[in-house]
Every structure is written in structure tokens, then in C-alpha cells.
Amino acid sequence: MYDLMIIGGGPAGLTAAIYASRAHLNTVIFEPEMDGGQMSLTMSLENFPGALPEDTGMAIGMRMAKQAASFGAATIRELVVSVESAGETKIVKTESGSYEGKYVLVATGSKPNRLGVPGEDKFVSRGISYCATCDGAFYQDGDVYVIGGGNSAVEEALYLANLGAKVTIVHRRDSFRAERFLAEKALAHENISVMWNTELKEVLGDAMADGLVLYNNKTDETFTVKKGDRPMGIFIYVGVKPQTEFLEGILELNRGYVKVDENQMSAVDGIYAAGDIVDKNFRQVINACGEGCVAAMAVAKRIVQYD
């Protein structure tokens, strides 16, 4: 039986694994995808303490996973489908097995929202991407359209522009929602232009995406942009959704986010939550790490005192 079962290998889950395994708790992480979670999709973490300019989110995630493993934390590459509380025993079920432990930390993070426009599902990975770090190199000499106006959209537009792509930010409002310094950098970049008050309505193409149907909500004009001689890429950044569907009916949720106390524990005794799935005001890598630390230390204290 595990002392702590951590669902999710992003910054919250990995920090918890580091603290728990270093405290000699029998710790396991369930992470079917890349270590680091959404952090791994970020090219630069300029506001993360100690991060160097050359540090990518992926590199930091890999180092955190290696650090957790060095203290003895195990990783199971399976998707968790349910969590059950049977008194003092917690049961985590994956697509292929069932695992028991004393405590659970849910740190499943969030996933990019989809716009839901015609052609979006068809052309994912065929011209449409949600990860500039992953796919930007394919379009370094291309024409790229970034959909969105928040921090993620503007940060990734800057990354793509610095690769050499000609970037057009398509934003439905007349100003960015991104932080001011990011907006100013984007507006000053020679490779970036902006279509204000413009919405993506459809993605066109056959085998690959080769056109966009756009709508200007100020002029009521609908128009089409077609691929030229250069590669065409579409990067969509319109928010994220907490990955908590498997917790419905188990934990108290608010719009999909988990309510926790000062020790990161949910309304169910022994089940904790940390990171982007927590009901809170700010979602940053740094506070995800802090929440993972708090949860792990709370579990370690309970094990010492009561188990």
C-alpha cells in the first residue's frame, strides 16, 4: 500500500512527490503523458524563481521528475479514471489496474479549451496546434495565426515570431487581456500583426488546414484567409479547462475546480488537491508548487502523528 498516491505529474504533483518521497513516504505518481504538465508547453518561465533564460518549461519539468525519482518516487504511466474513499483506504483506478493507498493528492491540472468551430477537430495536428513549443519549428518560415488575446496567446505569439514565423494574432476584442509588458512586446515586434475584433469561425482544408474563415464583429464582415506559398499554422489559446470530470460526485467542485482547506485537503478526508484544479484566484507554476508542498507536508505530518 502506498502512503501517497499523486494523480498528475505537473509542477504541483512533482513538488509533492519530491517532498513526500524525501520524507520517506512510499510515493507514486500517475502521469500518462509528459512530465511537467502544461508547464512543459511553455517556452519560457521568466517569472519562475531561479529559472535561466534558456530554461524551457519542458526542461524544468524533466528536472523536477528526475529529482522526485532520486528520492524514490515511482511513476506509473496510466490514466486515472476514478478515485474512491473506503474509510482509511483510498483506491485509485486506472484503465488497466487498481491501486490502494492511505492518501491521495489530485493534481491533474488543466487542458486547452477548444473553440468548437467547424474544421477544428479535423485539422488538429494537421495545421492546428495548442502547443507552440511542440510544433512551432514546423512553421518557422511560415504564416502563423494565433487565436486569443491572453497571456498564453501573446507569449506563444512572441515565441513563434522569434523563430522567424510571420505571426498574426486574431483577437475578438479591441485590446489584449495579456499583461501589459507582454502586450507591448508583441505590438512592437516586427514579425507580429494583430487582427482586432476578429473571430475564427471555420478552418478550411482537405488533408491539411489551408484557410480560415474570419468574422469582424465591429464591421460585421466575414472574410477568408487562404494559405500562400509558405507553411500555414493555426495555434489556439482560448483558456483552459480543469481536468476533474472523474471527480464529479466524489469531491465538492465549483465550475470544475476543487474546494480545499488551508492544508489543500478537499471535503473528503484524506483526498487533497493542488495546482490548476484548485478553486482560487491565481494559477501560476509557483503557487502550484507551493500547494503541492503543503499537501505533501500535511500528509507526512498525519502519517507521523496518527498512522
Locate predicted features.
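Phosphate-coordination loops involved in phosphoryl transfer and adenosine-cofactor binding
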Residues: 1-3, 77, 140-142, 197, ...
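Beta1-alpha1 glycine-rich phosphate/pyrophosphate-binding loop at the start
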Residues: 2-71, 154-179
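Conserved phosphate-binding and hydrolysis motifs of nucleotide-dependent enzymes
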Residues: 8-13, 109, 148-150, 275
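A Rossmann-like FAD-binding core segment of flavoenzymes
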Residues: 68-93, 98-100, 162-262, 301-307
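Glycine/small-residue-rich loop that forms an oxyanion/phosphate-binding "nest" at active or ligand-binding sites
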Residues: 75-138
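FAD-site-proximal beta/loop scaffold in flavoenzymes
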Residues: 116, 122-140, 236-287, 291, ...
